[in-house]
Amino acid sequence: MTTSKIATAFKTATFALAAGAVALGLASPADAAAGTMYGDPAAAAKYWRQQTYDDCVLMSAADVIGQVTGREPSERAIIKVAQSTPSVVHPGSIYTKPADAEHPNSGMGTSVADIPTLLAHYGVDAVITDEDHATATGVATGMAALEQYLGSGHAVIVSINAEMIWGQPVEETDSAGNPRSDHAVVVTGVDTENGIVHLNDSGTPTGRDEQIPMETFVEAWATSHDFMAVTT
């Protein structure tokens, strides 16, 4: 996934922000299932699929499409759509499959700013935001906002550092050596009582309803300045 130029992507991409921000709204804590679980990870788990290529953004989008419409596109199908859909961020299509089939992670991935365009092809509206652009987008981010979006029935894709949530040595760093976001996942639930964040993570064989300590998730998410794409 290409996430190192999120700021540039925000400047380049075009969204229907005003309508999206109004449609989002915020749920009260009482709207959370059982008072402590925001979202429904058990219901969302059936839409998890493991990725074959460097297409975590596409597979996260397919998961969300399944959650919203009940009709989840296959990896092959959503790759075909992404290959034929112009990017709003860069010249060419949203996605190009890696040329080296023996090294599926050798491609360029997908810009997170193309998520709304890809979802729109399937009739799913979404907006994107992060800490640096929340004022401009009118869409809040951070844990409190994430909980409320999930609690009110929205689907959410976030950008994180994968190695941090997998407990592996960090490979992607910025010029100062700080961890950099390199992976997209779907957040399906936040359990505030037990301090657990539930994910559908296409990047690992155990990614269906992957459960991550909240502190670890917050640190991994911070590498993208709390980037999220949320359905409206």
Swiss-Prot record:
Tell whether Signal is among the UniProt keywords: yes
- Pfam families membership: Peptidase_C39_2
Q: Which keywords fit this entry according to its UniProt record?
A: Signal
Under InterPro entries, the record lists: Pept_his_AS, Peptidase_C39-like
So which residues are the signal peptide here? 1-32
| The protein, known as | Uncharacterized protein Mb1299c
Q: Which organism is it from?
A: Mycobacterium bovis (strain ATCC BAA-935 / AF2122/97)
